[in-house]
UniProtKB/Swiss-Prot annotation:
Belongs to the OMP decarboxylase family. Type 1 subfamily. One of its GO terms (cellular component) is cytosol. SUPFAM superfamilies: Ribulose-phoshate binding barrel. InterPro entries: Aldolase_TIM (IPR013785), OMPdecase (IPR014732), OMPdecase_AS (IPR018089), OMPdecase_bac (IPR047596), OMPdeCOase_dom (IPR001754), RibuloseP-bd_barrel (IPR011060). Catalyzes the decarboxylation of orotidine 5'-monophosphate (OMP) to uridine 5'-monophosphate (UMP). It comes from Bacillus cytotoxicus (strain DSM 22905 / CIP 110041 / 391-98 / NVH 391-98). It is an enzyme of class 4 (lyase). It catalyses: orotidine 5'-phosphate + H(+) = UMP + CO2. This is Orotidine 5'-phosphate decarboxylase. Its EC number is 4.1.1.23. Pathway: Pyrimidine metabolism; UMP biosynthesis via de novo pathway; UMP from orotate: step 2/2.
Amino acid sequence: MSKSLIVALDFPGKKEVEQFLQHFEGEELFVKVGMELFYKEGPAIITYLKEKGHKIFLDLKLHDIPNTVKSAMRSLASLDVDMVNVHAAGGSSMMKAALEGLEEGKQEGKERPICIAVTQLTSTSEVMMKKEIGIEKTLEEAVAHYAKLTKESGLDGVVCSTLEVPKLREVCGDEFVTVTPGIRLASDDVNDQVRVATPKRARELGSSYIVVGRSITKAENPLEAYQTVKQQWEGVTV
């Protein structure tokens, strides 16, 4: 199965995760563990998923003073997760501190986790950004600014909308990692996300990784839905 397709385990606890993963016995997935699940189950959920052979994107979006983020990342790296993130709005010093913590905390003989930054949440519209957050740039300009700052700080890439990927390729180059949530099958509701795209569109726009949640986790047949997303993402004709 594709390692560039990340399945969001947006469940309230381990019981629901176990029920979901029964559909994928023997398969190694790349999964995302977010705040809800991690805060409920703690590091034990990471250990459980690793024992099952899955890769893990631990999506906690750290945003604090540099020393606190450094210490937190040192702890997270010791869990042997594969990807972590911070908010780019925390600034360059904070992002550099995150990398230092990951290097110090990584397990012996292992590479440090991929570290990416959130530019703007996919629930953020330009009106919201200007009116409520107080950023006067256009949404595209703000995302590009944060992405450039992220690259200059030494991080591997950003979380962004698929619609922003082409511009970020221009600004940050082809090797810069773009992780894009807000992915839905064409038949699904968009729910609370504003900037969404299909797996096919994400591929066409050049995303490095896509994160898919409800289209798979809420499907009547999760494995079948996963395969459909995977085929669209990889451009496989069936």
